[in-house]
Amino acid sequence: MPNLNESAKSKGVVIFATNTRETDYVAIAEQNARLVQHFLGLPTTIVSATDTGTNRRFSSDTGTFVEWNNFGRHEAYEASPYDETIILDADYLILDDSLDQLFQCPFDYLLFNGNHTIDGVYESNTMGPHSLPFVWATAVMFRHSEQTRMFFDLVARIKRNYDYYRLLYNVREGNYRNDYAFAIAHYILSGYRVARNTFAPHTITTFAGAIISIELRDGRVVVRSDQAYVLPMQSLHVMSKQYLTSPNLKEFVDQCLSTMPRKAS
């Protein structure tokens, strides 16, 4: 287990962003890096995975299936220049310091097994009717250690042999997902059980539908879609890529940086 009393350890964030024909994920990551610096006080490294492929995902903006390249999360262990790392999807907007506080916990790697979708879109908490509990790779925390290296090596093996592992663990969806590979690797590495001591104590908050705007008002986050949602100041997983690639995202980030307290580095 890592020594939490070591003061010389470096901390930082790795954001994975691989562009597609429809979406400039790197541009989204660059705006999120500004939020990371402001709310977490940490440096950011943006990584475009080398292990790529093509999946399709359903777009809440267009109601159609679009290209989705999200394969290389297993590269994070080698890609991170930090001793202690937060891995983020580009579209998980950091709006508080709760992730940084989790570094006070003892762990080799820390996963999120809970997701709260605020606009009522339901997603099962398992990977299939007779499969394992879901894990969200939207945010993952880890420290460099032998246990963590084994975990990411196992994720890479599952990715290479995904058709086999998908059938073995009764995964319903045909698309490869980092979420599924992380869940299976965690289950195997924990002795073929669901070890909850490596789960984060809080959930990821997601807005799954199309978004018109996001703004701050009186210290709260106001998301406008088909109706308005008023949220506490908290990090938010935004599925609307149309919003994230519009000028509205930069305007929202500018508002956050100019009105909310900055965390000391």
Please tell me what each predicted stretch does.
Residues D89-L93:
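The conserved acidic donor/metal-binding loop of glycosyltransferases
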Residues M1-I15, V26, S131-A139, R143-S265:
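A glycosyltransferase accessory/donor-loop signature
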Residues Q31-L42:
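Short, acidic, metal-binding catalytic loop of nucleotide-sugar glycosyltransferases
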Residues T20-A27:
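A short, glycine/small-residue-rich beta-strand->loop->alpha-helix junction that serves as a flexible
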Residues I46-T54, I94-D96, N115-H116, F199-A200:
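Short, polar loop motifs at secondary-structure junctions
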Residues D96-G128:
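Conserved donor-nucleotide/metal-binding helix-loop-beta segment in metal-dependent transferases, i.e.
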Residues T85:
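Short aromatic/hydrophobic "clamp" motif used to bind/position activated sugar donors
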Residues S48-S80:
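Active-site-proximal specificity loops/subdomain of glycosyltransferases
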